[in-house]
Swiss-Prot record:
Biological source species: Acinetobacter baumannii (strain ATCC 17978 / DSM 105126 / CIP 53.77 / LMG 1025 / NCDC KC755 / 5377)
An example Gene Ontology biological process: translation
Subunit structure as annotated in this protein's UniProt entry: Part of the 50S ribosomal subunit; part of the 5S rRNA/L5/L18/L25 subcomplex. Contacts the 5S rRNA. Binds to the 5S rRNA independently of L5 and L18.
Alphabetical list of NCBIfam families matching this protein: PRK05943.1
Keywords from the named record: Ribonucleoprotein, Ribosomal protein, RNA-binding, rRNA-binding
Name of this chain's protein: Large ribosomal subunit protein bL25
Molecular function, one GO term: 5S rRNA binding
Lineage per the UniProt record: Bacteria, Pseudomonadati, Pseudomonadota, Gammaproteobacteria, Moraxellales
Family indicated by similarity: Belongs to the bacterial ribosomal protein bL25 family.
Length: 98
């Protein structure tokens, strides 16, 4: 199936927004969203180290990725990735359901 498997945690409503995202980034976490298909969008948090490791491969941008959110598995493709302008570290990721 997918070569890339990422573990994520769902974010509550109070953990969304500019200030909350900044706090997550200070803890080496990356805010992300999963959308598309018939299901509602899901705000998730990924570990920075795990995402950077996956980004080292160019295939990550072309293949279907599995994201485990709790006990649920989402098959997604990366839609957009925002990086820090100076550090080049991921700041936010958008995933679209496949």
């Amino acid at each position: 199936m997918a070569n890339f498997v990422l573990n994520a945690q769902a974010r509550a409503e109070d953990k969304q927004g500019k200030g909350a995202s900044r706090r997550l980034r200070r803890e080496s976490l990356v805010p992300a969203i999963i959308y598309g298909g018939n299901a509602e969008p899901v705000a998730v948090t990924l570990e920075l180290r795990e995402l950077v490791k996956a980004l080292e491969s160019n295939a990550f941008f072309e293949e279907v990725v599995e994201i485990k959110v709790g006990d649920k598995v989402e098959n997604v493709k990366i839609q957009a990735l925002q990086r820090h302008p100076a550090k080049n570290t991921p700041m936010h990721a958008d995933f679209k359901r496949a």
